[in-house]
Amino acid sequence: MTTQRIKERGSILVYILLGVVLLGLLTIALRNAGTGGVSDIDKEQMILKAGQAQKDAAELAAAVNDLIANGVSEADLRFAHPDAPTEYGNITDNPTNQVFGKQGGKATYKSPPEGINDGSPWEFFGSSQIIQVGSDRSELIAVLPNVTESFCKGMDAQLGFDPTLQPTDNSTGSSPDCVMGTSSDRFTGTFSDASPNVLDKATFSKLPALQACVYCAADSTYNYYYVLLAR
């Protein structure tokens, strides 16, 4: 075997080994890029869904304020709908007072964006006093219950809260004990002004908090609220 052929074979072997190394590096790079891509997509989807939840809540607030402007009292506002829990009543009762009624607020009854909670519908309460909003009375709020922790933290970050400080609704042991009330707390005209649920001011890095996602210590759930009517 000539020296030239030996050199050629040696060069081929070097190229083969170099190709294997480069292929391995490319595989690692693509894998890392793929992981980052999925993460970016998930983050983008979360941002879009958080924005959709805020938009839906803002539309409800607009409907409530339209009814108030048209002379409906805050105690006469109703949130009945065929797909809503029965405690909210019948949408055909006093139709001009119904937030979702065609003769009332004309709001669209929407399901939460998919994947951000356990599928529970929007709820409506007058049992929580929101920090630095209105007076010392309870506000009328919409609540998106049982959202995921990741959605909650993402929502609060998007709203400008300190990411190291989770807004919290501490437990007092008495009812109401969370922005997400019980079935008996569903709004049908009565506000809990005498003994409202009060949030933990020290955990809110941004005030007033007309909307936020809070951790409820009473049942270890995360719930997003939006003030429909400050009082």
Locate the predicted segments by residue.
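Membrane-proximal N-terminal amphipathic helix
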Residues: 41-72
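N-terminal single-pass transmembrane signal-anchor helix
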Residues: 2-38, 43-53
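Short, glycine/small-hydrophobic-rich surface segments
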Residues: 64-106
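Intrinsically disordered, low-complexity regions enriched in Pro/Ser/Thr/Gly and acidic residues
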Residues: 95-231
